[in-house]
Amino acid sequence: MESTDSSDSSGDSLKSIPRPDFEALSAIGSPQPQLQSSSLDGHVEMEPVIMPSKRQKYIVSAPPGSANCSSNSSSSSPSNINVGSSLTMKLTKVQPQQHQAKSSTPNNKGKVAKEMVALQRSHIESEVLSNFVTGVSKLKSRKSRYVPGNLATQAVGGELSRSLNTSSENENKSLKVALKRSSSIPAPILDSDDDWQDEDIAWGVTTCRPRGRSMAFEDGERLANLNAEDRNIVPAYSMATRCRSRSKTLSLSNSWSNDDKGPRRSNLRSENEEFAKKHNAFLDRIIHDDRESELALNTSGEGESSLFSDASDTKTTTAKTPEEEAAERLALIYEEPPTPGWDPFCWKCRGCGKLMPCSKCLRSFHSYCVRPATTKFDSSWKCPECQVIEAAPKRLRRNGVSVDLLSQLLSFALDRMKHVRGAHKLRSPLEVFPLTYKKFFVNPVSFESLAQCIRNGAYQSTDEFLSEVKWIQHNALILDAGDAKVEQASKAVVKVCRQEANEIDTCPECYLNANSSDEWFVKVCRHPHLLLWAKLKGFPYWPAKAMGSSNSTLVNVRFFGKHDRAFVPVKDCFLYSAQNPNTQTSRRSARDLAECIREVEIHIDHIKRKIGAFNYAPYRTPYDPLEEQQQLEQMMPGVYAAIDRELEPANKTPLQFLIRKTADDKLSIVKKTKATESGNESDQSPSPTKKLSEVDVVSVTGSGCSDHSNVKSNNYEVISRSGESLTDSRCKVLLKRKSLAAKIVAESVETSEAVAPKRKHSLSDASFTSESSEHKRKSKHARKQHDNQDNQIEEAEKTGQEPPKSPTISKQNENLRDEENVIENAANDTSSASPVSASVVSVVELVRRRQGVTITKIPREQQQTAEDTAAVPIPLPTAPPPKQNIPKGNEAANPKQSDVERQQEQLIKKVIPFIEIKTEVMSEPDDEGIEEASPANQPQTDQVPLQQETITAQPESQMPAAAPAPQPKPVDNAPFEEVRIKEEILSEDEMETEQSIVSRRLKSVPPMPLPMPPPPPLPPREESPATADSVRFVGDTTIQRVSQKQGGKSTDTGGKRKGVQQVPIAGIPQAPSPTHSPLLSTAPSPSASPKPTSTLAVSKPPPPPPPKGKSASHLQFRGKNDRIPTSPPATAPPATNTSSLLRSNMVVIPVEQGGSCNAHSPMTIPVPPLRAVSKNTLQNTSTGSTSSCVPSSVSMPPPLAGLSIPPVATPTSQEESITNSGQPVGLLASALNGTANDVLSSDSIPNDPITPGLATALSEMLLHTGVPKLIARPRGALRSDGSQIYPSQAGPVSQKLKENAHKITDYFISVIEDTLSDMATGDQSVLQARIAGLSLENERLKQHYDRQINDLHRTSELMISEMRKTLEQEHKRVISELRQQNAIELMRAVEEAKRKQWCANCMREAQLYCCWNTSYCDYPCQQLHWPGHSATCGQSVPPTIPVPPSVPTPIIEPGRAKAKVATPTATPSITNPSPSSQIMRTVAACPSAPPSANASSSKKWPPMMTLMNQSNQEAMLKLPATTYLRPVVSTTMTAPVTAPQPANNNSTNVIMAPTPPPGNNLATIISAQRNPPNYNAKHPNPAMPVQRFNIPLPITVNSNAPFMMAEQHQKQVPKATGRSGKNNSRMRQTYSNNINNSNPQGMRCNNNPQAIRQNQMNQQVFQP
């Protein structure tokens, strides 16, 4: 070990002066040195070799002049050193030898300069240091041992002294400050230890710098981590002392320089390396005894690790992570939850203890944290949070919101919450305690978990979401308790969430628009907001929207302009008028207001476009929240009708599409037929069955086309764009159709999704469906819309079509127009382009015709594959030729086509609401079908790729639809590639329109004979890839169009299906084809209903691809206006058959089984344009036999915007399929028409009358699903569940067939319904069919009504229960209010009663006061009550002179006539008072009366006789000023008043005794005392007049009593009116004044002789 810590030269460690770490000892109060950070860096740069293993010391040395001190280091007396020198000493930093820094042995150490040692010794011995060191002697044994070694090293290195001002000195200082790494910690790989040096240096600098702070704390803290030996050796107080001195000594070396080095001394023992080594080892053994073994291992100078370095290292090693601290803190407060799995922390106060668990959620509460405190806690107790959530659905909201839309809105709210300041500080318990969080946190919610729940649609209301967000705050306040920033952030997140939830509840549509559009405020919600002029205090009236009224006094408004929201009093709101209600505004406000009004005008324009009209309200019309609906209707006429149209599009519009999820998970969009229009319209909402059947038809056609197309359709959803759906009244998934509007109780996308298996015929009301679908479309959050848009754009790019501007059909319609034009051009330009354009056209046609379309989603990969396969000349030659033909035809008929297209587009716009096609990648690949189709079509590779053809749904058909006129008449013998398109049943108008369109197209597009090589038997079905062609890819979505009505559904699958050609149905004589064409021509070209019927061409496995041109020519296109009869090349099934099929709205898919002729042309059943008058025209036209070679492209209905029609794959051989399908088609058509065509019936009836239709449907189904080809008459399949023919275990296809078998049931049910409806409503109506149809409708209605009644019952019961609860609550409230009111009234009455005096006898209000708590209403009551009251009367005073009762003495009441000024009036004593004399109070204004004759004239005062009361009790009665007493004296009493007393001006009371019986006379009259006892020292108030009374009762006047009653004999003397003493206080005052008035000298209280008089309240004593 190095001896860097060796003691000074003497080696006497006991006498060495202890030095604290990092500093020399000094008493000089120099300023604290500034340790610059540069010293840290400088050290590393300049002296990388210096190791911190040696402590560097500052050595105090005197300037060179004072270096002569050589006293022994052992001497500590201050005499050896000059005090002044100690003050001038400089502190030099001693550095270890650089070269030997890492060596633990002192062999290479140089000797310390003697002069330096002497200087150090002299400084140590200074008196100042001695005084300083006295308290720290215990540290000597350890702290002075490092200096000699350092001195030696420093001397050898030539760096004994170095100024701290130099950079090198700063480095050394930092080295000294730096703590050495503990020997127990292995050294880092770097030998220089620069890394940890720098850290320790920085730590040392921070710990050493503060001067004002108590260093004892820091050092004591470090000391606490020392080992036991260190703590024993070094007491804490010495450490504190050393720390105090540090800041002073550090600055001593500021002025020291290298020039001041003294000569070396060689007589130091420390120079002996052996001694230094032993000494150091000894000290280290004592200090670091427990680490000796570790020190032995370190040979790089780390052996002598300092105590403080050890302390710091220990601290760092034992530092706890925040997670551990949180775990320990939670463990301290944790208590078991009330129930396992519940929250152990109170939801309110976040404390543990005795908690009450909620029965609905995991929250727990203290009983005292729940309000009200009287809550009953039992097993069914629900916490306040759960109560709020349960009440959420009952709260009135402006608009309902679907779960999907709510999820989308909540995602916006979550994004806003994530941007709250400090939200990143909210840690999830999962992050902190990934393994043990469940113990403390039962619901660790984070933003990620919220996002996942939102995606999963877990929240049914905003209250649920807010309740979940509160868990974030709850967990954060528990996990980071005491962290103010976390608390603020959590509160801010909850606040933002609450605000967003309120906004969502206020108006979901506005909230969605606000987060998705910059122009959201001018858009019109489905339920428009009322426009107001609203005024906030301090602001002018401002235009605003009324978002809703929270109560009857405040309105929630949003102002135009900055879109601020506020609650405005109702009284400050006026309906929006054209005239500004502001009287005047400032210039700035006027400018801003003008801008806002412009925005309002834009909004009003939107309202007019959506609602149709807007009326300004009259000037200053008050807004009434209770009349909001009426006011809204007044301002926006027809607004509620528009809302109803949106909510129930099926009932309002002629065309409806039923979107149904079929058994194969395919979403089918089906037109509802007009059949049973009356019934179905009523049924529309209740009976989606027909539509479902149509949907099934779609799927069937799809099956004909390809299984893959079905799969694609499975995942498709039709969703209206959220933005437009909100604003567009027509954006409904259900396309409105007159006849089937009711039928369309189309299952909305929701329904389809919800009912995947399914075959519910009546899913939901059309209105509900539309709503749900609308919401779904919205809700399929923007992401789906974006996906659709992207997909559509990609698809459009792929197909060469313009990308649809929006997923909505309206936009798609525009796109379709463009696409159609493009398609037409493409078709004209190139056959290769034509397939794509044809597909577009087919979509357009479908849209125009408003026929049922199945939207099939094809995964993008599959789409690409399909396109590739299409590129491969798999497509039947028919498809390409039609394209070629189409160009020709287009050239010829472009003008017609353009006109027709325009008309069709207009129709589409009118009919089809915006539909957003939601694309979802189908799990099932279309590749199989594509592959199958491709092999089948491969022989036809010469032809356009199947997909292209199919995309064109025989592009030819689509192209013709796009440009029906251009094509020349389809060549009768040219085989048409038939794309199986299932048509929905069309209403008559629609059918006529479709027929006309088809006929036009047929005329315009001459069917080009495409010799189709006999397609491989069912493999062509695999043309399902071709379906890709027939199925138009919009984005990733493909739409298969199914027109059930068109029996001859043109299966352009020929294009898809490897050139499935229209093959005349075998059973149907082809000769009728001419008839068919005439019929077609006959059909009115313009059909009343815009729906064009698309001919269903059954595409059989395409035969060897015929020349594309031929196929194109064969494609028959019926223009809506063009009735050009398309005569199938050779044999067309009887037109009647086809028409009948169309009329029945059944989708008849003739199956071409490998007939060569059929192979050349897939059977196309052209549907003649329907006449508005009748469907017979349909019967006339039979598309089935239109030349078998005619490509099925014949009149493909335009797909819904962006929808592509998958061609129906032909089963087995085209011939067989044609034959089979032909017969069924004929039979079915005849059955539908109600007339059996001879040919068809003969062919189709053969075995089972049902077989033909069923066989056709089954064949289509099988083709659609891609199952093996059907037998001509699959009786087994029809008569069994199919398990024998296609056992589910046979393979995946068979399994799928089995699983989807119920689709056939649905399909046939719908077909039968349509058949019945057609038969009942046709020209030759069948009564039984009508009865059956009506019965069916009746059953549906009954079920629907039952359901409605049940709903009403349930709703009414709920309402009644709620009303009952409300009434009970109201009853309780009213009772409580009444009780409170009664209690208040009672208290008030009691108070009033207390304020009044009540008669002690009769309890009436008392006017006369007797004594305390005794008053009377009148004298009789006093007399009656006196016997009981006399004993306790406060007036009773023992008589001064008893008067015997035998002495009769008449009462003489001296009359007083004194002015109110208290002038005494002489009252003559009345000798003979008359009994009738009245007692009167003298009026104050009366002049004084002359003295009576009886009175001694010499006296100024009237003679008054004082009657001293005997011992009998007396009653004191307080008389009001207005009270007069009648005299009751029976005998005349004469008694001169002997001694009048000073008058009591305030006396208003009289003492009354019960009236004696007439026989009793007054007792002897005793003269009153002139000096009655003065009970109070007060003098009477002379200003108060004395009231005199004529008392009718014998009155005993007590001289001591304060009251006097004077009886005036017969004549009334004017009396001074005194104030009536009505109040007890007046009485008490009078009483005291009367007592005080007794004055022996009769002294006058006033200088005025009249004012001064003796007490006139002479007491008259009466005896009973």
Swiss-Prot record:
CDD domains linked: Bromo_RACK7, PHD_PRKCBP1, PWWP_PRKCBP1
Basic residues bias spans: 775-784
GO biological process, one term: nervous system development
Compositionally biased tracts (Basic and acidic residues): 258-271, 785-800
ZnF start-end (PHD-type): 343-389
Keyword set includes Ligase: no
InterPro entries tied to this protein: Bromodomain, Bromodomain-like_sf, MYND_ZMYND11_ZMYD8, PRKCBP1_PHD, PWWP_dom, Zinc_finger_PHD-type_CS, ZMYND8_Bromo_dom, ZMYND8_CC
Pfam families in the cross-refs: MYND_ZMYND11_ZMYD8, PWWP, ZMYND8_CC
MYND-type ZnF: 1399-1433
Protein name (database record): MYND-type zinc finger-containing chromatin reader Zmynd8
Organism (species): Drosophila melanogaster (Fruit fly)
Gene name of this polypeptide: Zmynd8
